[in-house]
């Protein structure tokens, strides 16, 4: 008989903790609904709690569809590594042949410099720079008009805030607009969030000769059996979507960010490699399990062990960590691989050193723990209000680890 991987009593406690977040007043941080999955060495538990839409009270289901936003990034990184394995891309080669719009960059002297106050880039952008978010351009935690470069980037609608698929132009136009701007930092100098993944998606499409949605479907989603994951939801599945909610700071009320049948119900002009996908918890579990199995899915190899090990190992130098992440102290206990965060110091009753994963700001989080064989997935329909994980995500992570049997 196989030993239990989780304590049944402690799993019941974990469910009660999650239910408390669902039953809490939504005007005071409560979650309308969620789906949670924990897995360890073949033992899988899934819970669906609350509703996926407040107005209809439609219940959350195991196959409810969520906008996974930045949990798209690990998938895009894995797709790029497929092309690296095929030697169509090399990690340290310049991206200029594929993305000539980004060649010959100028770099701001300081983040707050006028757009004309620049110096030449010291080297081209590499594939590795895109995978590690060190291309020299990205999101900054500041008001949209805090610096000239932020104002210019927002005016060009290149995706400097929460995902808005309907607002972004087609890939060629997106890259042209990005190429008009000076960089915020020298290539390879520091970690800057998000834009690298969007540029990586364009690189994958141009290198493979296929639109990004087609490449992901043929090379990742179909082999992994991920039937629910795409950049838009087909008409027959729209009823399974959750409504996406956010906290309206002006009114103090919970408001609709994207309704069922909203922006993700039709193919976008720009398939965002950084934040564009819709998925279900079962689909993302298949992707997470493939990584935990060192690139294998059933009898098929999707990625090499070497690719997965590189993707899930810390790529940042101490100097780059000292320059900071989205918020001060982000890299005190974590690093960054290829599209994933790596735990470098355990600071909570949750994922230990060597664990990896990432969050989606529209309300999702994922972690793989190779040492314990644990996969933890939480999908909610409420936006995070900060890059810091909200209480429901922190409590979920703690609940998973308090429930493990030795």
Label every model-predicted segment.
Residues 18-22, 41-42, 67-95, 197-205, ...:
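Active-site SXXK
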Residues 10, 14, 18, 68, ...:
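Hydrophobic (often cysteine-bearing) scaffold residues that line and stabilize catalytic clefts
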Residues 46, 106-353:
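Short, surface-exposed loop or secondary-structure junction motifs
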Residues 96-104:
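Acidic helix-start/capping segments at beta-turn-to-alpha-helix junctions
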Residues 8-68, 88-90, 106-116, 401:
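Short, conserved catalytic-motif segment at the N-terminal edge
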Residues 382-406:
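Generic C-terminus detector
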Residues 366-368, 373-382:
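Short, well-ordered beta-strand elements
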């Amino acid at each position: 008989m196989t030993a239990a991987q989780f304590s049944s009593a402690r799993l019941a406690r974990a469910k009660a903790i999650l239910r408390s977040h669902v039953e809490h007043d939504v005007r005071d941080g409560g979650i309308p609904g969620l789906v949670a999955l924990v897995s360890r060495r073949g033992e899988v538990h899934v819970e669906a709690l609350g509703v996926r839409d407040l107005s209809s009270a439609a219940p959350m289901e195991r196959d409810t569809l969520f906008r996974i936003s930045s949990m798209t990034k690990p998938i895009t990184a894995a797709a790029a590594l497929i092309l690296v394995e095929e030697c169509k891309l090399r990690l340290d080669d310049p991206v200029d042949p594929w993305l000539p719009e980004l060649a010959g960059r100028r770099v701001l002297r300081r983040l707050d410099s006028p757009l004309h106050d620049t110096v030449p880039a010291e080297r081209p952008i590499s594939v590795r720079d895109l995978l590690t978010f060190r291309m020299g351009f990205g999101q900054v935690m500041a008001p949209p008009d805090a610096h000239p470069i932020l104002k210019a980037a927002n005016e060009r609608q290149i995706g400097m805030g929460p995902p808005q698929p309907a607002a972004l132009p087609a890939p060629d136009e997106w890259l042209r607009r990005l190429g008009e701007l000076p960089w915020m930092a020298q290539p390879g100098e520091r970690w800057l969030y998000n834009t690298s993944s969007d540029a990586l998606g364009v690189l994958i499409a141009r290198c493979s000769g296929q639109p990004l949605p087609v490449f992901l479907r043929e090379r990742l989603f179909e082999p992994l059996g991920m039937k629910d994951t795409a950049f838009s939801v087909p008409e027959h599945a729209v009823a399974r979507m959750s409504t996406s909610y956010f906290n309206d700071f002006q009114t103090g009320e919970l408001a609709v960010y994207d309704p069922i049948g909203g922006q993700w119900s039709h193919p976008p002009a720009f398939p965002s490699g950084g934040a564009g996908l819709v998925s279900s918890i079962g689909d993302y579990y298949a992707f997470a399990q493939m990584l935990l199995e060192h690139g294998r899915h059933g009898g098929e190899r999707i990625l090499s062990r070497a690719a997965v090990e590189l993707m899930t190992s810390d790529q940042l130098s101490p100097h780059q960590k000292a320059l900071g992440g989205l918020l001060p102290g982000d890299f005190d206990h974590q690093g960054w691989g290829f599209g994933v965060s790596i735990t470098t110091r355990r600071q909570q009753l949750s994922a230990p050193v060597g664990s990896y994963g990432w969050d989606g700001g529209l309300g999702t989080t994922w972690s793989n723990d190779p040492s314990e064989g644990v996969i933890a997935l939480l999908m909610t329909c409420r936006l995070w209000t900060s890059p810091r994980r909200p209480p429901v995500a922190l409590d979920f992570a703690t609940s998973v680890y308090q429930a493990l049997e030795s």
